[in-house]
């Protein structure tokens, strides 16, 4: 129903390594981000959540935090930076870091769970792990899902015969669908915690 619509004002930060990976072409990076956000919008529309890109910051000179292969440390640093720096400059609900750094092990993204609207913890870090916009967009949708209180799908969760967004492992052919479990968990979190920042559009 429309009255339960929520709005996530999303801010995306691009680290210096990713800037260099795209040969310093900010326009190309921005185009990629817009494609990714459109995919995320589509994915979240069935959840009655609108994803609105409120800003992009590209670290074209140098990284403003220590980005490292240990994803938990990078997430911690990014959260602190968001809380003390970015939030003072730009109004937004959630921030995601895109990095060219190859995180340790099979990790391609990491985020806090059930943390939407928290100054430090409404954040995630995403490895730019594929040439395909879809693959990285689904990874970001997945990490944002954790911020919205959604945990990984178990065997009984389904999204109509596809590989769902909150699957513990990214499929080679991911879908833009959340499972029935994800919908229930997301709205349980929203109804119980009532994160204020996503009630309005900026």
From Swiss-Prot:
Q: Which cofactor does it need?
A: Zn(2+)
The record places domain Peptidase M12B at 6-202
Q: Which cysteines are joined by disulfide bonds?
A: 117-197, 157-181, 159-164
Question: What tissue expression does the UniProt record report for this protein?
Answer: Expressed by the venom gland.
Active site location: 143
Q: Keyword Secreted on this protein?
A: yes
Q: Which SUPFAM superfamilies match?
A: Metalloproteases ('zincins'), catalytic domain
Would the keyword Plastid turn up in this protein's UniProt record? no
- Additional remarks: Negative results: does not cleave laminin-1 (laminin-111, LAMA1/LAMB1/LAMC1), integrin alpha-2/beta-1 (ITGA2/ITGB1) or integrin alpha-3/beta-1 (ITGA3/ITGB1).
Q: What does this protein do?
A: Snake venom zinc metalloproteinase that acts on fibrinogen, fibrin, fibronectin (FN1), type I collagen, type IV collagen, integrin alpha-7/beta-1 (ITGA7/ITGB1) and integrin alpha-1/beta-1 (ITGA1/ITGB1). Binds to fibronectin (FN1), fibrinogen and, weakly, to type I collagen and laminin. Cleaves Xaa-Leu bonds. Inhibits ADP- and collagen-induced platelet aggregation both in the presence (IC(50)=1.4 uM for collagen) and in the absence (IC(50)=2.2 uM for collagen) of cofactors. Has hemorrhagic activity.
Protein name, per record: Snake venom metalloproteinase atroxlysin-1
């Amino acid at each position: 129903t429309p009255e339960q619509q929520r709005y996530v004002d999303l801010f995306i930060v691009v680290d210096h390594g990713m800037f260099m990976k795209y040969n310093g072409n900010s326009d190309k990076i921005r185009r990629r981000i817009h494609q990714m956000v459109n995919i995320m919008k589509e994915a979240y529309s069935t959840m009655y959540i609108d994803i609105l890109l409120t800003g992009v910051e590209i670290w074209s000179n140098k990284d403003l935090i220590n980005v490292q292969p240990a994803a938990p440390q990078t997430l911690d640093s990014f959260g602190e930076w968001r809380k003390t720096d970015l939030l003072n400059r730009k109004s937004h609900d959630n921030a995601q870091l895109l990095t060219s750094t190859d995180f340790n092990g099979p990790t391609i993204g990491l985020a806090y769970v059930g943390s939407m609207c928290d100054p430090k913890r409404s954040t995630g870090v995403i490895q730019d792990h594929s040439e395909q916009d879809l693959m990285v967009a689904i990874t970001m949708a997945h990490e944002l899902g954790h911020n919205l209180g959604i945990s990984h799908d178990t065997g009984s969760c389904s999204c109509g015969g596809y590989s769902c967004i909150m699957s513990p492992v990214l499929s080679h052919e991911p879908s833009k669908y959340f499972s029935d479990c994800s919908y229930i968990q997301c709205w349980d979190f929203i109804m119980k915690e009532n994160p204020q920042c996503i009630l309005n559009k900026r």
